[in-house]
Amino acid sequence: MDFTHFDDVAFAYYGLPDQSSLVSLLDHTHTFQSPTAFPQHQAMSGLAHSGLPFGTLPTGNRSQSMEGSKAPPDRTSPASNAFENPTTDEFGLASCNRADGTDLGGKPREDKAGATPAWSGLKTKAGKERKRLPLACIACRRKKVRCSGEKPACKHCLHSHIPCVYKVTTRKAAPRTNYMVMLDKRPKCMEERIIKATPKSDQEVASFVTRPVVKPAIPGAVPSSKPTKKRGAEEAFGLDLEAWAKAPSKPKIEGDDRPSSLQAQEGEENKLQHEGTEALPSEEIQEHLAEVFFDNIYGQSYHLLHKPSYLRKLKNGTLPPVLVLTVCAVAARFTSNPLGGRSWALGGQAIRMAFALQLHKDLEYDPSGRNGAKTQLSFIDREIRRRIMWACFLLDRFNSSGTDRPMFIREDTIQIPLPVKEKYFQFDMPAPTELLDGQVPHPPSPNDGQIADARENMGVAAFLIRAIALWGRIITYLSQGCKDLDPNLLWEEEPHYIKHLNDAVNLEASLPLSLNYSAENLEVHKTENAASQFLFMHICLQHNILLVSRAAMSARKQQGVHDDFFSEASQRTFSAANRISEFLREAEQSRCFVSAPFAGYCAFSSATVHILGIISCNPSMKPTAEANLTTNVKYLHKMKKYWERATQLSFLQYGDWYNRYPRGLSDAEFMDPATHKRKDSGADGVLEAKPELRSVEEYSTLPTPRRVENKDTIRAAAPKRKQSAKKQTGMPAQPGQHLDSLQSTDADAVSQERKFSGGLGLQITGAAGFNPLSASNQQNPDFSTTMSPTSPANMTPFSHYAHTPTFFPPELLSIDFGQGSNGNIDPLDRQLIYGGYSMDASTGLCGGQDMMSGLGWDTVASGAQPDGCLQGRPPNVKAGMHGQSAASSSFPAINKTNGKGKEGRGIGSHTDYGLLVIAAADDVGGDMMQYMTNSVLPSTPHKVGLNLRERFAFAYFHEPSFQAVVRPLPGYDHGQEPKGGIHYGKQFTDMFMRNYPQRITTQRLNDEGRYRLLDQESLQTMSP
């Protein structure tokens, strides 16, 4: 065909010069050529015009236009004779070496025979011709491709446009190890590692594993006659595998000539190690609760277990079931699983068992060795023994925080070092630490390889133990009689008080730099999962300072007291309370929940100080106190999720919380036990619940059984009480009585006294209306002249409880609460036990009572000293309707509804008007508390009467001042009405007049126009 007839559509067709790079098209553009440009024949020599090897890409400007291409047409023209050209087909495409995969996109292979390697002229060290490349470049070695060996750049690096580097080293190549020899050595090395890392107890369990038997060679098999340098599996492992498979699973101890009684005893002990296996939960629950234990309980306050070894043994099933069940029971309280658990601890038994095991001594050998055999204790074993003993020590200190609870463990009996840092314990790194008194028992030598500074080796656990030990010494001094035996005064330089104060301050100052409180150290402890322990330690340190400084207020009324001494004590008290709130706020922001119950005790102690800061006249103290009190209330509210049962206790001291289960059983298990066949209790019978005995809780809540011989006396006394009540009802009110001295005298307001004589064995001879608080106290003249918060003079005149009596029964006052020589409970936790101090009407906070001890709010709000220490109100200021009151009453079984008169005095569901009411088995917030916290702490409806059984109540009422204007706390004012606050005097008067419209007090308020006086600004001068 003549191409001259198709000039308009003539074009040059180009084949693919490099089919391995289809995605990288070259600048072979289409050009319009004359037909004469196409030769009829194309020889092989036509491939050499480009000057590049076959398969490589020609260089040039890749952005060149199609019209500017100058590619030779004789290579790709379809007009060439393809039948005479063996390298092209009828379409002009290259067809050489199609079997090498280039037609499918593969890279063409280079002609090995046509090219001589650059290293072919080199000689080996032996003088022979080199057949292999001596050294490949770094790039080819990384990509694991064959290197051409050219220098300065090989073909691969030149083609890839990367630097070509040959790494020359003088190190001789190691001789190649026989493959079978290498396989033979690897299991032995791994076995040696496992044996070194596995404890002895785990090795004994591993010996019971069934071992497989190696199958023998197949009979009749002809061995390979081909010689080889590698050994066969039978030759390499035959002897070892045969000896290992034939070894007994449990080696028999030869020469065991122990007596049969000892063998039987060991058999019983081994049986006890597996007792309780059937009660274990699933493995998933065990592992989950173990993680919960180490996240929420470990280190707050007890450092008992070694987490890596515990989790390893838990997975292997080598832990005693009793230990697994104990960890699960303790951790169940903090799990998100709704099925909670119960746990209790017999502290006395734990302490005796610890001493029996000689845990209080730092021994190098196991003291329980049989037949005098001494087993060396490893560092982990010794550290676990120490931590168990320190846990018993802390438990004894917490359990002995009450007023009449002596401590059993003396500090000088513990001869073991304090725990090491947690990372040393986790990674099995021995390190010396100090004793409790600061001495180093075994100082290491420089060649031991241990850290010489013993103080730097101690972490949070060690200083937490020192803080709790100091707290125990402070309690012993303040609460258990040591303060009364101290002949020196508190402000002198020699008394024990100054020593305890210096110890509390110096303990915080002695912390290493890594344990000082800072944002950096907190982040470091976060990474170690010990931030909660770190914050808890600092809370305990500040609580010691708060406790000692607050106790100094009780000596204010004594002669010769320096004002500077009490000014410094007040500043330290408020500073420590603020620091505790800061730590709680930081824990909330860092999401590090401090779950120890003792932290809640510290938060409550701090909150009592913040309340005084809120009602202070010093304007600089109020904002800080309000913010800190909000933080403490939030934290205590969160603690209710885990320690909810603690709110139902009759005694509010921290140490008395352990009286919750005096039998070791909860109420649900004791009152409604499961029916089962009674078994012989054996030696544990002393710990059983005795049905004929009564617990402390039953004694406080259930009526006291009356003796038969006293029935006639009780029946005869009932009409006398009724006649006395009628006489009191008929007494007219005094006409000139002022508003703040108005008082209702309804006979129905006086309830029956609780009779403690049957249970306490007390002799009561006084009349029913006798008030023992009005009698003089010859032994304590100062106490008799002070205004007690339980006296009628301090009772609220507008008593909104019809059942509130005007006196304490003499039986209750006769109970010994461990009072000091001044007639009051010692300064330990006075805000937790009502009536714990005397209150001088002429002095306030700085006048001898504690931060919350018997103070009315308007008592401390009348003035403030420059240092922030609150003053009391002047002697001419009357008490008014404010302060604290308490009552102990008896309520008979009644089913009458509310109504007028004596027939309807059931007093059903209601709320209280004031700020806070603490009653037996109830913590009832008042209406003011609900308004201040925006219903976070609601005013709980509760019943006084309308019960089918007789009940006894001991109630404590904390009332705001009559002049107080209550406002919501910061952060709780969203949507609160009224926004301007509530005047408590008007609120209380409205409630009184609505509930008692027929009383003479209500009539006088209306007739004499006294109700309008509540609008005067002089009666709205206080803002709590």
UniProtKB/Swiss-Prot annotation:
A Gene Ontology cellular-component term: nucleus
Biological function: Zn(2)-C6 fungal-type transcription factor that has a role in the establishment of the fungus within the plant and/or the progress of the disease. Regulates the expression of virulence factors such as SIX1 and SIX6.
Molecular functions per Gene Ontology: DNA binding; DNA-binding transcription factor activity, RNA polymerase II-specific; zinc ion binding
Induction: Exclusively expressed during infection of common bean.
Protein name as catalogued: Zn(2)-C6 fungal-type transcription factor FTF1a
Gene3D superfamilies for the chain: B-lactam Antibiotic, Isopenicillin N Synthase, Chain (2.60.120.330), Zn(2)-C6 fungal-type DNA-binding domain (4.10.240.10)
Compartment(s) where it occurs, according to its Swiss-Prot or TrEMBL record: Nucleus
Ranges annotated as DNA-binding: 137-164
